[in-house]
């Protein structure tokens, strides 16, 4: 059983959490940077990434706009992204294998 399953987090929230973290790392952004771009507090981003928050459609739209991706991309279980920054690529390879 994964940490998400133990916490009762749905698969959609798990996908969203991982996708936001993946997109954020691929751009070399901190949680603070993403939060500022969306008009959120850093702890809100942290809670989304840990799967603790249900995200409203309005907030999902703000996150998608910050990443310049369609909302559907945030919920897409395909995690293949082109990573340009070596440090981000190393982290993602280590974290997601």
Where are these regions (language model features)?
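A short, Lys/Arg-rich alpha-helix, primarily the initiator
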Residues: 2-26
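DNA major-groove recognition helix of helix-turn-helix/homeodomain DNA-binding modules
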Residues: 58-73
């Amino acid at each position: 059983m994964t940490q998400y399953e133990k916490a009762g987090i749905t698969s959609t929230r798990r996908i969203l959490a991982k996708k936001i973290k993946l997109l954020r790392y691929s751009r070399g952004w901190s949680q603070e940077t993403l939060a500022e771009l969306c008009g959120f507090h850093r702890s809100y981003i942290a809670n989304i990434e840990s799967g603790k928050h249900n995200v409203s459609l309005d907030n999902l739209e703000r996150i998608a706009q910050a990443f310049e991706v369609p909302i559907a991309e945030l919920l897409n279980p395909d995690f293949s992204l082109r990573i340009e920054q070596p440090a981000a690529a190393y982290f993602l390879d280590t974290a997601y294998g």
